[in-house]
Amino acid sequence: MKKHILALAFLLFLANFPFFGSPQIQKRLPFSKGVNLPVWMESSRLNTALYGKKDFENIKSLGVEVVRLPVWFEIWNEGAPDYKVSPECFEMIEKAASWCGELGMFLIIDFHNDCNGSSKTNPKIEQILLKVWPQVAERCKNMGSFVIYEVMNEPHFTSGNLKGDIAKWAKIQGNALKAIRAVDPERLVIVGGGDWNSLDSMLALPDYKDENLIYNFHDYTPFLFTHQGAPWTYLKRITKIPFPYSKEKMPPLPKNATADERREWTNYQKDSSEQNLCSPLDKAVEFANKRGAALMCNEFGVSLKYADPKERVNWYRLKCGWMDERKIIRVSWDYTQEFGLFKSTSQTRFPEDLNAPLLQAMGYKVPAGKSQSWLLAAKTSGGYSIYKNGDTGLLRAYGYGASGSLAFSQNGEEKCARFFDIAPYSAFYFDFGEACDLSALKEGGARIEFEIKSADKALDLSLYFKDSEDKTFPWRAASSLKGKFKANGEWQKISIPFSNFSDIGGWSQTDGWKNGAGKFDWTVIDSLVFQNGAAACKEGYSVRAIRIAQ
Protein backbone atom coordinates (compact mmCIF):
# COMPACT_ATOMS: atom_id res chain seq x y z
CA MET A 1 0.00 0.00 0.00
CA LYS A 2 2.82 2.36 0.94
CA LYS A 3 4.46 1.73 -2.46
CA HIS A 4 1.20 2.63 -4.25
CA ILE A 5 0.92 5.88 -2.29
CA LEU A 6 4.52 6.80 -3.09
CA ALA A 7 3.95 6.01 -6.78
CA LEU A 8 0.83 8.17 -6.87
CA ALA A 9 2.68 11.02 -5.18
CA PHE A 10 5.48 10.73 -7.74
CA LEU A 11 2.99 10.87 -10.64
CA LEU A 12 1.39 13.99 -9.18
CA PHE A 13 4.84 15.53 -8.83
CA LEU A 14 5.59 14.81 -12.49
CA ALA A 15 2.27 16.41 -13.49
CA ASN A 16 3.28 19.61 -11.76
CA PHE A 17 6.93 19.47 -12.83
CA PRO A 18 7.15 17.61 -16.17
CA PHE A 19 10.69 16.39 -16.80
CA PHE A 20 11.70 18.55 -13.82
CA GLY A 21 11.14 21.68 -15.91
CA SER A 22 8.50 24.34 -15.37
CA PRO A 23 5.28 23.18 -13.69
CA GLN A 24 2.24 23.13 -15.97
CA ILE A 25 -1.46 23.71 -15.49
CA GLN A 26 -3.35 20.42 -15.69
CA LYS A 27 -6.79 21.81 -16.58
CA ARG A 28 -6.64 23.23 -20.10
CA LEU A 29 -9.22 25.32 -21.92
CA PRO A 30 -9.66 25.73 -25.71
CA PHE A 31 -7.91 29.11 -25.76
CA SER A 32 -4.48 30.25 -24.63
CA LYS A 33 -3.87 33.87 -25.62
CA GLY A 34 -5.83 37.05 -26.07
CA VAL A 35 -6.07 40.79 -25.72
CA ASN A 36 -8.01 43.40 -23.74
CA LEU A 37 -10.25 45.90 -25.51
CA PRO A 38 -10.38 48.81 -23.03
CA VAL A 39 -11.93 52.29 -23.26
CA TRP A 40 -14.85 51.08 -25.42
CA MET A 41 -17.13 50.48 -22.41
CA GLU A 42 -14.98 51.93 -19.65
CA SER A 43 -15.21 55.14 -17.59
CA SER A 44 -17.46 56.94 -20.10
CA ARG A 45 -20.49 56.20 -22.25
CA LEU A 46 -18.99 58.38 -24.97
CA ASN A 47 -16.64 55.79 -26.47
CA THR A 48 -19.15 53.34 -27.94
CA ALA A 49 -18.17 54.21 -31.53
CA LEU A 50 -14.50 53.48 -30.89
CA TYR A 51 -14.61 49.90 -32.22
CA GLY A 52 -16.75 47.89 -34.62
CA LYS A 53 -16.99 44.48 -36.24
CA LYS A 54 -14.00 45.21 -38.50
CA ASP A 55 -11.81 45.66 -35.41
CA PHE A 56 -12.88 42.25 -34.12
CA GLU A 57 -12.09 40.75 -37.53
CA ASN A 58 -8.66 42.40 -37.42
CA ILE A 59 -8.01 41.08 -33.92
CA LYS A 60 -8.99 37.57 -35.00
CA SER A 61 -6.61 37.74 -37.98
CA LEU A 62 -3.68 38.16 -35.57
CA GLY A 63 -4.40 34.78 -34.03
CA VAL A 64 -6.14 36.11 -30.92
CA GLU A 65 -8.33 33.46 -29.29
CA VAL A 66 -10.04 35.41 -26.50
CA VAL A 67 -11.07 39.07 -26.10
CA ARG A 68 -11.51 40.59 -22.65
CA LEU A 69 -14.14 43.33 -22.65
CA PRO A 70 -13.80 45.69 -19.66
CA VAL A 71 -17.27 47.04 -18.83
CA TRP A 72 -17.52 49.72 -16.15
CA PHE A 73 -20.97 48.60 -14.96
CA GLU A 74 -20.95 51.27 -12.24
CA ILE A 75 -21.62 53.91 -14.92
CA TRP A 76 -23.76 51.65 -17.10
CA ASN A 77 -26.63 51.38 -14.61
CA GLU A 78 -29.39 53.62 -13.28
CA GLY A 79 -28.21 53.64 -9.67
CA ALA A 80 -29.60 52.45 -6.35
CA PRO A 81 -31.55 50.57 -5.28
CA ASP A 82 -31.90 48.27 -8.30
CA TYR A 83 -28.80 49.24 -10.30
CA LYS A 84 -30.69 48.47 -13.51
CA VAL A 85 -28.22 47.98 -16.35
CA SER A 86 -28.67 50.33 -19.31
CA PRO A 87 -30.23 48.81 -22.46
CA GLU A 88 -27.41 50.41 -24.48
CA CYS A 89 -24.88 48.52 -22.36
CA PHE A 90 -26.54 45.21 -23.13
CA GLU A 91 -26.73 46.12 -26.82
CA MET A 92 -22.96 46.69 -26.84
CA ILE A 93 -22.25 43.43 -25.02
CA GLU A 94 -24.51 41.51 -27.38
CA LYS A 95 -22.78 43.02 -30.42
CA ALA A 96 -19.39 41.96 -29.07
CA ALA A 97 -20.70 38.48 -28.27
CA SER A 98 -22.24 38.14 -31.72
CA TRP A 99 -18.99 39.11 -33.43
CA CYS A 100 -16.87 36.83 -31.22
CA GLY A 101 -19.25 33.93 -31.77
CA GLU A 102 -19.20 34.43 -35.52
CA LEU A 103 -15.40 34.70 -35.59
CA GLY A 104 -14.73 31.78 -33.25
CA MET A 105 -13.25 33.81 -30.38
CA PHE A 106 -14.05 33.61 -26.68
CA LEU A 107 -15.34 36.72 -24.90
CA ILE A 108 -14.75 37.73 -21.28
CA ILE A 109 -17.35 40.10 -19.82
CA ASP A 110 -15.27 41.87 -17.18
CA PHE A 111 -16.93 43.89 -14.40
CA HIS A 112 -14.39 46.69 -14.61
CA ASN A 113 -13.91 49.64 -12.27
CA ASP A 114 -11.91 52.74 -11.41
CA CYS A 115 -8.26 51.66 -11.16
CA ASN A 116 -6.42 54.96 -11.05
CA GLY A 117 -3.58 54.96 -8.55
CA SER A 118 -5.48 56.98 -5.93
CA SER A 119 -8.79 55.14 -6.35
CA LYS A 120 -10.45 52.71 -3.98
CA THR A 121 -13.20 50.16 -4.49
CA ASN A 122 -16.73 51.46 -4.02
CA PRO A 123 -17.84 50.69 -0.42
CA LYS A 124 -21.22 49.62 -1.84
CA ILE A 125 -19.65 47.23 -4.32
CA GLU A 126 -21.30 44.12 -2.86
CA GLN A 127 -24.80 45.57 -3.31
CA ILE A 128 -23.93 46.57 -6.88
CA LEU A 129 -22.47 43.17 -7.78
CA LEU A 130 -25.46 41.32 -6.31
CA LYS A 131 -27.83 43.42 -8.43
CA VAL A 132 -25.85 43.67 -11.66
CA TRP A 133 -24.57 40.11 -12.11
CA PRO A 134 -28.02 38.42 -12.03
CA GLN A 135 -29.13 40.84 -14.76
CA VAL A 136 -26.07 40.07 -16.88
CA ALA A 137 -26.38 36.33 -16.30
CA GLU A 138 -30.09 36.39 -17.20
CA ARG A 139 -29.33 38.29 -20.42
CA CYS A 140 -26.38 36.08 -21.40
CA LYS A 141 -27.29 32.64 -20.03
CA ASN A 142 -28.41 31.35 -23.43
CA MET A 143 -25.28 32.53 -25.23
CA GLY A 144 -22.74 29.89 -26.18
CA SER A 145 -20.04 28.67 -23.82
CA PHE A 146 -17.60 31.04 -25.54
CA VAL A 147 -18.90 33.81 -23.24
CA ILE A 148 -17.12 33.99 -19.86
CA TYR A 149 -17.90 36.14 -16.82
CA GLU A 150 -15.32 37.89 -14.64
CA VAL A 151 -16.69 38.78 -11.19
CA MET A 152 -14.67 41.98 -10.89
CA ASN A 153 -11.43 43.58 -12.01
CA GLU A 154 -8.78 44.62 -9.46
CA PRO A 155 -10.78 45.09 -6.24
CA HIS A 156 -8.78 47.26 -3.85
CA PHE A 157 -10.15 48.36 -0.50
CA THR A 158 -8.00 50.78 1.48
CA SER A 159 -8.76 50.18 5.16
CA GLY A 160 -5.07 49.97 6.03
CA ASN A 161 -5.48 46.28 6.94
CA LEU A 162 -4.45 44.51 3.74
CA LYS A 163 -5.06 41.01 5.06
CA GLY A 164 -8.53 42.02 6.21
CA ASP A 165 -9.29 43.70 2.88
CA ILE A 166 -8.27 40.56 0.97
CA ALA A 167 -10.50 38.41 3.18
CA LYS A 168 -13.37 40.88 2.82
CA TRP A 169 -13.16 40.69 -0.96
CA ALA A 170 -12.98 36.89 -0.92
CA LYS A 171 -16.33 36.78 0.90
CA ILE A 172 -17.95 39.36 -1.41
CA GLN A 173 -16.73 37.45 -4.45
CA GLY A 174 -18.21 34.23 -3.06
CA ASN A 175 -21.60 35.91 -2.63
CA ALA A 176 -21.47 37.34 -6.17
CA LEU A 177 -20.59 33.89 -7.48
CA LYS A 178 -23.67 32.42 -5.75
CA ALA A 179 -25.83 35.12 -7.36
CA ILE A 180 -24.45 34.21 -10.80
CA ARG A 181 -24.90 30.48 -10.22
CA ALA A 182 -28.55 30.97 -9.27
CA VAL A 183 -29.14 32.10 -12.86
CA ASP A 184 -26.32 30.54 -14.91
CA PRO A 185 -25.03 27.39 -13.16
CA GLU A 186 -22.42 26.08 -15.62
CA ARG A 187 -20.80 29.19 -17.14
CA LEU A 188 -17.03 29.65 -16.84
CA VAL A 189 -16.39 32.40 -14.28
CA ILE A 190 -13.11 34.17 -13.57
CA VAL A 191 -12.21 34.91 -9.94
CA GLY A 192 -9.29 36.93 -8.61
CA GLY A 193 -7.72 38.26 -5.44
CA GLY A 194 -8.59 41.36 -3.44
CA ASP A 195 -5.37 43.34 -3.79
CA TRP A 196 -5.51 44.67 -7.37
CA ASN A 197 -5.76 41.06 -8.62
CA SER A 198 -2.24 40.46 -7.37
CA LEU A 199 -0.91 36.93 -7.54
CA ASP A 200 -0.38 36.75 -3.77
CA SER A 201 -3.98 37.78 -3.05
CA MET A 202 -5.17 35.10 -5.50
CA LEU A 203 -3.24 32.51 -3.49
CA ALA A 204 -5.21 33.61 -0.40
CA LEU A 205 -8.62 32.91 -1.98
CA PRO A 206 -10.82 30.26 -0.37
CA ASP A 207 -11.94 27.18 -2.27
CA TYR A 208 -15.33 28.18 -3.68
CA LYS A 209 -16.12 24.52 -4.48
CA ASP A 210 -16.99 25.33 -8.08
CA GLU A 211 -15.71 23.24 -10.98
CA ASN A 212 -16.12 25.98 -13.58
CA LEU A 213 -13.78 28.64 -12.24
CA ILE A 214 -10.69 30.20 -13.78
CA TYR A 215 -8.29 31.64 -11.20
CA ASN A 216 -6.79 34.90 -12.38
CA PHE A 217 -3.98 37.32 -11.57
CA HIS A 218 -2.38 40.39 -13.14
CA ASP A 219 1.36 40.67 -13.80
CA TYR A 220 3.12 43.98 -14.41
CA THR A 221 6.44 42.91 -12.91
CA PRO A 222 8.98 44.40 -12.63
CA PHE A 223 6.82 47.46 -11.94
CA LEU A 224 9.70 49.92 -12.27
CA PHE A 225 10.17 48.87 -15.90
CA THR A 226 6.55 48.37 -16.99
CA HIS A 227 5.25 51.62 -15.45
CA GLN A 228 8.28 53.90 -15.68
CA GLY A 229 7.18 57.52 -16.08
CA ALA A 230 3.47 56.65 -15.68
CA PRO A 231 1.79 59.83 -14.39
CA TRP A 232 -0.83 57.92 -12.35
CA THR A 233 1.87 56.14 -10.29
CA TYR A 234 4.68 57.07 -7.90
CA LEU A 235 7.13 56.39 -10.76
CA LYS A 236 6.30 59.45 -12.84
CA ARG A 237 9.76 60.96 -12.20
CA ILE A 238 11.72 57.84 -13.17
CA THR A 239 12.36 56.90 -16.82
CA LYS A 240 15.03 55.21 -18.97
CA ILE A 241 14.86 51.99 -16.92
CA PRO A 242 16.58 49.10 -18.77
CA PHE A 243 15.34 45.52 -19.06
CA PRO A 244 17.02 43.30 -18.20
CA TYR A 245 18.83 45.12 -15.41
CA SER A 246 22.09 46.82 -16.38
CA LYS A 247 24.03 48.78 -13.80
CA GLU A 248 25.58 50.93 -16.53
CA LYS A 249 22.19 51.87 -18.01
CA MET A 250 20.38 52.63 -14.76
CA PRO A 251 19.35 56.29 -14.42
CA PRO A 252 20.14 58.13 -11.18
CA LEU A 253 17.51 58.43 -8.50
CA PRO A 254 15.50 61.67 -8.70
CA LYS A 255 16.48 64.41 -6.30
CA ASN A 256 14.72 64.15 -2.95
CA ALA A 257 13.59 60.64 -3.82
CA THR A 258 10.46 59.38 -2.10
CA ALA A 259 10.47 56.12 -0.14
CA ASP A 260 8.59 54.41 -3.00
CA GLU A 261 11.04 55.65 -5.62
CA ARG A 262 14.03 54.61 -3.54
CA ARG A 263 12.61 51.15 -2.81
CA GLU A 264 11.81 50.39 -6.46
CA TRP A 265 15.16 51.70 -7.68
CA THR A 266 17.21 49.89 -5.00
CA ASN A 267 15.45 46.54 -5.46
CA TYR A 268 15.30 46.59 -9.25
CA GLN A 269 18.24 44.24 -9.89
CA LYS A 270 16.61 41.55 -7.75
CA ASP A 271 13.03 42.32 -8.81
CA SER A 272 13.90 42.01 -12.52
CA SER A 273 15.75 38.69 -12.24
CA GLU A 274 14.28 35.61 -13.91
CA GLN A 275 14.09 33.86 -10.55
CA ASN A 276 11.96 36.60 -9.03
CA LEU A 277 9.75 36.90 -12.11
CA CYS A 278 9.12 33.16 -12.55
CA SER A 279 8.90 31.85 -9.00
CA PRO A 280 5.44 33.44 -8.42
CA LEU A 281 4.19 31.82 -11.65
CA ASP A 282 5.21 28.41 -10.32
CA LYS A 283 3.34 29.07 -7.06
CA ALA A 284 0.25 30.07 -9.03
CA VAL A 285 0.39 26.87 -11.11
CA GLU A 286 0.70 24.73 -7.99
CA PHE A 287 -2.25 26.56 -6.40
CA ALA A 288 -4.53 26.15 -9.44
CA ASN A 289 -3.63 22.48 -9.84
CA LYS A 290 -4.56 21.78 -6.23
CA ARG A 291 -7.96 23.35 -6.96
CA GLY A 292 -8.30 21.48 -10.25
CA ALA A 293 -8.81 24.80 -12.02
CA ALA A 294 -7.55 26.64 -15.08
CA LEU A 295 -5.21 29.60 -14.56
CA MET A 296 -5.22 32.95 -16.34
CA CYS A 297 -3.22 36.16 -16.33
CA ASN A 298 -5.64 38.57 -18.00
CA GLU A 299 -3.59 41.72 -17.64
CA PHE A 300 0.11 42.12 -18.35
CA GLY A 301 2.05 44.67 -20.34
CA VAL A 302 4.53 47.54 -20.62
CA SER A 303 3.73 51.18 -21.32
CA LEU A 304 5.22 52.14 -24.69
CA LYS A 305 5.79 55.76 -23.72
CA TYR A 306 9.18 55.54 -22.02
CA ALA A 307 10.41 51.93 -22.31
CA ASP A 308 13.11 51.22 -24.87
CA PRO A 309 11.21 49.62 -27.82
CA LYS A 310 13.56 46.63 -28.17
CA GLU A 311 13.66 46.01 -24.43
CA ARG A 312 9.87 46.26 -24.31
CA VAL A 313 9.58 43.59 -27.02
CA ASN A 314 12.06 41.40 -25.14
CA TRP A 315 9.96 41.70 -21.96
CA TYR A 316 6.88 40.44 -23.85
CA ARG A 317 8.87 37.62 -25.45
CA LEU A 318 10.03 36.42 -22.04
CA LYS A 319 6.71 36.88 -20.23
CA CYS A 320 4.70 35.15 -22.94
CA GLY A 321 7.24 32.34 -23.10
CA TRP A 322 7.19 31.79 -19.35
CA MET A 323 3.39 31.68 -19.26
CA ASP A 324 3.16 29.46 -22.34
CA GLU A 325 5.62 26.98 -20.80
CA ARG A 326 3.33 26.71 -17.78
CA LYS A 327 0.11 26.62 -19.86
CA ILE A 328 -1.14 29.81 -18.20
CA ILE A 329 -3.76 31.56 -20.34
CA ARG A 330 -2.46 35.05 -21.14
CA VAL A 331 -4.50 38.10 -22.09
CA SER A 332 -2.42 41.24 -22.60
CA TRP A 333 -3.36 44.79 -21.70
CA ASP A 334 -4.18 46.21 -24.24
CA TYR A 335 -4.97 46.73 -27.97
CA THR A 336 -4.67 50.34 -29.23
CA GLN A 337 -3.81 52.24 -26.04
CA GLU A 338 -0.57 52.92 -24.16
CA PHE A 339 0.15 49.24 -23.44
CA GLY A 340 -1.03 48.15 -26.88
CA LEU A 341 -0.01 46.28 -30.00
CA PHE A 342 0.60 49.36 -32.16
CA LYS A 343 3.72 51.49 -32.53
CA SER A 344 1.99 54.54 -31.07
CA THR A 345 -1.38 55.59 -29.68
CA SER A 346 -1.89 58.37 -32.22
CA GLN A 347 -1.66 56.17 -35.34
CA THR A 348 -3.56 52.86 -35.16
CA ARG A 349 -4.12 51.88 -38.77
CA PHE A 350 -4.44 48.13 -39.24
CA PRO A 351 -2.10 46.63 -40.27
CA GLU A 352 0.35 49.44 -41.18
CA ASP A 353 0.85 50.75 -37.64
CA LEU A 354 1.06 47.41 -35.85
CA ASN A 355 4.25 46.72 -33.90
CA ALA A 356 5.46 43.73 -35.92
CA PRO A 357 8.37 42.71 -33.63
CA LEU A 358 6.01 42.83 -30.65
CA LEU A 359 3.41 40.65 -32.39
CA GLN A 360 6.08 38.10 -33.27
CA ALA A 361 7.37 38.08 -29.70
CA MET A 362 3.83 37.34 -28.49
CA GLY A 363 3.28 34.51 -30.96
CA TYR A 364 0.83 36.39 -33.19
CA LYS A 365 0.64 36.68 -36.97
CA VAL A 366 1.84 39.82 -38.73
CA PRO A 367 -0.77 40.66 -41.39
CA ALA A 368 0.20 42.06 -44.76
CA GLY A 369 -1.68 44.63 -46.79
CA LYS A 370 -2.95 48.14 -46.25
CA SER A 371 -5.98 49.50 -44.48
CA GLN A 372 -8.74 51.32 -46.29
CA SER A 373 -8.59 54.94 -45.21
CA TRP A 374 -11.68 57.00 -44.48
CA LEU A 375 -10.57 59.65 -46.99
CA LEU A 376 -10.02 57.18 -49.84
CA ALA A 377 -13.37 55.51 -49.17
CA ALA A 378 -15.06 58.91 -49.06
CA LYS A 379 -13.48 59.98 -52.35
CA THR A 380 -14.53 56.72 -53.98
CA SER A 381 -18.12 56.93 -52.81
CA GLY A 382 -18.40 60.69 -53.10
CA GLY A 383 -20.01 60.85 -49.66
CA TYR A 384 -17.88 62.35 -46.91
CA SER A 385 -20.06 61.14 -44.03
CA ILE A 386 -18.59 61.52 -40.55
CA TYR A 387 -21.56 60.57 -38.36
CA LYS A 388 -24.94 59.27 -39.52
CA ASN A 389 -27.61 57.54 -37.44
CA GLY A 390 -25.10 56.42 -34.82
CA ASP A 391 -22.58 55.13 -37.36
CA THR A 392 -19.08 56.56 -37.86
CA GLY A 393 -17.94 54.13 -40.55
CA LEU A 394 -14.15 53.92 -40.67
CA LEU A 395 -13.71 56.73 -38.15
CA ARG A 396 -13.18 56.28 -34.42
CA ALA A 397 -15.29 58.51 -32.18
CA TYR A 398 -14.80 59.17 -28.48
CA GLY A 399 -15.35 61.86 -25.89
CA TYR A 400 -14.65 62.90 -22.32
CA GLY A 401 -15.89 65.30 -19.65
CA ALA A 402 -19.63 64.80 -20.18
CA SER A 403 -22.51 62.39 -19.79
CA GLY A 404 -24.46 61.17 -22.77
CA SER A 405 -24.59 58.67 -25.58
CA LEU A 406 -23.26 58.36 -29.12
CA ALA A 407 -26.38 56.49 -30.21
CA PHE A 408 -29.26 58.34 -28.54
CA SER A 409 -32.70 57.96 -30.07
CA GLN A 410 -36.09 59.26 -28.97
CA ASN A 411 -39.56 58.74 -30.41
CA GLY A 412 -38.19 56.74 -33.33
CA GLU A 413 -35.96 59.56 -34.59
CA GLU A 414 -32.62 58.77 -36.19
CA LYS A 415 -29.77 58.30 -33.73
CA CYS A 416 -27.76 61.28 -32.58
CA ALA A 417 -24.83 62.05 -30.29
CA ARG A 418 -26.25 63.48 -27.06
CA PHE A 419 -24.17 65.33 -24.44
CA PHE A 420 -25.16 66.86 -21.08
CA ASP A 421 -23.55 67.73 -17.73
CA ILE A 422 -20.64 69.00 -19.80
CA ALA A 423 -17.47 70.02 -17.96
CA PRO A 424 -15.33 72.99 -19.06
CA TYR A 425 -13.26 72.22 -22.16
CA SER A 426 -14.71 68.72 -22.55
CA ALA A 427 -14.46 67.40 -26.09
CA PHE A 428 -15.92 64.93 -28.56
CA TYR A 429 -13.51 63.58 -31.21
CA PHE A 430 -13.87 62.06 -34.65
CA ASP A 431 -10.50 60.47 -35.38
CA PHE A 432 -9.70 59.89 -39.07
CA GLY A 433 -7.23 57.10 -38.25
CA GLU A 434 -4.44 58.64 -40.31
CA ALA A 435 -3.29 62.07 -41.46
CA CYS A 436 -5.74 63.16 -44.18
CA ASP A 437 -5.01 65.75 -46.84
CA LEU A 438 -8.09 68.00 -46.89
CA SER A 439 -6.35 70.88 -48.66
CA ALA A 440 -8.01 70.18 -52.04
CA LEU A 441 -11.42 70.09 -50.38
CA LYS A 442 -10.69 73.41 -48.71
CA GLU A 443 -9.58 74.99 -51.98
CA GLY A 444 -12.70 73.61 -53.65
CA GLY A 445 -15.00 75.38 -51.19
CA ALA A 446 -15.89 72.40 -48.99
CA ARG A 447 -17.85 72.93 -45.79
CA ILE A 448 -18.84 71.04 -42.65
CA GLU A 449 -22.57 70.39 -42.35
CA PHE A 450 -24.50 68.97 -39.40
CA GLU A 451 -27.71 69.29 -37.44
CA ILE A 452 -27.68 70.50 -33.85
CA LYS A 453 -30.28 70.86 -31.10
CA SER A 454 -29.97 72.61 -27.73
CA ALA A 455 -32.05 74.60 -25.27
CA ASP A 456 -29.01 75.57 -23.22
CA LYS A 457 -28.33 79.31 -23.47
CA ALA A 458 -25.05 78.83 -21.58
CA LEU A 459 -23.64 76.58 -24.29
CA ASP A 460 -20.33 77.86 -25.67
CA LEU A 461 -19.36 75.39 -28.36
CA SER A 462 -16.64 75.45 -30.98
CA LEU A 463 -15.62 73.09 -33.74
CA TYR A 464 -12.01 72.56 -34.78
CA PHE A 465 -9.81 70.46 -37.01
CA LYS A 466 -6.58 69.18 -35.46
CA ASP A 467 -3.53 68.41 -37.54
CA SER A 468 -1.28 65.42 -36.95
CA GLU A 469 0.56 64.86 -33.67
CA ASP A 470 3.30 63.12 -35.63
CA LYS A 471 4.53 66.60 -36.47
CA THR A 472 6.37 68.69 -33.91
CA PHE A 473 3.13 70.07 -32.46
CA PRO A 474 -0.63 69.52 -33.10
CA TRP A 475 -2.21 72.80 -34.25
CA ARG A 476 -5.92 73.62 -34.46
CA ALA A 477 -8.12 75.51 -36.92
CA ALA A 478 -11.40 76.41 -35.22
CA SER A 479 -14.78 78.01 -35.79
CA SER A 480 -17.04 79.15 -32.95
CA LEU A 481 -20.67 78.02 -33.05
CA LYS A 482 -21.80 80.90 -30.86
CA GLY A 483 -24.70 82.73 -32.51
CA LYS A 484 -24.93 80.20 -35.35
CA PHE A 485 -28.10 78.54 -33.98
CA LYS A 486 -30.92 79.29 -31.55
CA ALA A 487 -31.14 77.63 -28.13
CA ASN A 488 -34.78 76.66 -28.70
CA GLY A 489 -34.61 72.86 -28.41
CA GLU A 490 -35.30 72.39 -32.14
CA TRP A 491 -33.11 70.71 -34.76
CA GLN A 492 -31.25 73.25 -36.91
CA LYS A 493 -28.86 72.78 -39.81
CA ILE A 494 -25.39 74.33 -39.64
CA SER A 495 -23.03 74.80 -42.58
CA ILE A 496 -19.48 76.15 -42.05
CA PRO A 497 -17.06 76.61 -44.97
CA PHE A 498 -13.53 75.34 -44.35
CA SER A 499 -12.38 78.89 -45.13
CA ASN A 500 -14.10 80.06 -41.92
CA PHE A 501 -11.80 77.95 -39.76
CA SER A 502 -8.88 79.96 -38.38
CA ASP A 503 -5.59 78.95 -36.76
CA ILE A 504 -6.12 79.42 -33.00
CA GLY A 505 -3.09 77.56 -31.66
CA GLY A 506 -2.85 74.13 -30.08
CA TRP A 507 -2.13 72.08 -26.99
CA SER A 508 0.00 69.08 -26.14
CA GLN A 509 0.69 67.29 -22.88
CA THR A 510 4.38 68.08 -23.24
CA ASP A 511 4.26 71.76 -24.26
CA GLY A 512 0.89 72.92 -22.97
CA TRP A 513 -0.96 75.65 -24.89
CA LYS A 514 0.60 77.65 -27.73
CA ASN A 515 -1.12 80.52 -29.52
CA GLY A 516 -1.70 80.37 -33.27
CA ALA A 517 1.37 81.00 -35.39
CA GLY A 518 0.06 80.28 -38.88
CA LYS A 519 1.42 76.73 -38.74
CA PHE A 520 -1.84 74.80 -39.05
CA ASP A 521 -1.54 72.32 -41.94
CA TRP A 522 -4.61 71.23 -43.95
CA THR A 523 -2.60 68.39 -45.55
CA VAL A 524 -2.25 66.34 -42.33
CA ILE A 525 -5.62 66.47 -40.55
CA ASP A 526 -6.16 63.71 -38.01
CA SER A 527 -9.41 64.65 -36.25
CA LEU A 528 -12.52 66.82 -36.08
CA VAL A 529 -13.49 67.96 -32.58
CA PHE A 530 -16.53 69.52 -30.90
CA GLN A 531 -15.33 71.31 -27.74
CA ASN A 532 -17.11 73.08 -24.91
CA GLY A 533 -15.82 76.43 -23.65
CA ALA A 534 -14.59 77.55 -20.23
CA ALA A 535 -17.98 77.27 -18.48
CA ALA A 536 -19.78 74.09 -17.49
CA CYS A 537 -22.97 73.31 -19.38
CA LYS A 538 -25.86 71.46 -17.74
CA GLU A 539 -28.42 70.75 -20.47
CA GLY A 540 -25.92 70.32 -23.28
CA TYR A 541 -26.67 69.56 -26.92
CA SER A 542 -27.37 66.87 -29.50
CA VAL A 543 -25.74 66.59 -32.91
CA ARG A 544 -26.38 64.36 -35.93
CA ALA A 545 -25.88 63.97 -39.70
CA ILE A 546 -22.29 65.29 -39.69
CA ARG A 547 -20.58 65.37 -43.09
CA ILE A 548 -18.25 67.26 -45.36
CA ALA A 549 -20.18 68.79 -48.25
CA GLN A 550 -18.65 69.98 -51.52
Where are the regions a protein language model picked out?
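Positively charged n-region of N-terminal signal peptides that target proteins for export
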Residues: 1-4
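Bacterial N-terminal signal peptides
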Residues: 7-16
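Active-site mouth of glycoside hydrolases
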Residues: 25-188, 193-202, 212, 339
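A cross-family glycoside hydrolase active-site/sugar-binding cleft signature
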Residues: 36-38, 68-72, 108-112, 150-152, ...
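Short, solvent-exposed loop/turn elements at domain surfaces
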Residues: 40-47, 223-226, 396-397, 505-506, ...
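Active-site region of glycoside hydrolase catalytic domains
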Residues: 130-273, 278, 282-302, 325-326
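Aromatic-rich peripheral "rim/lid" segments of glycoside hydrolase catalytic domains that contact
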Residues: 305-381
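Beta-rich carbohydrate-recognition modules and glycan-binding surfaces
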Residues: 372-550
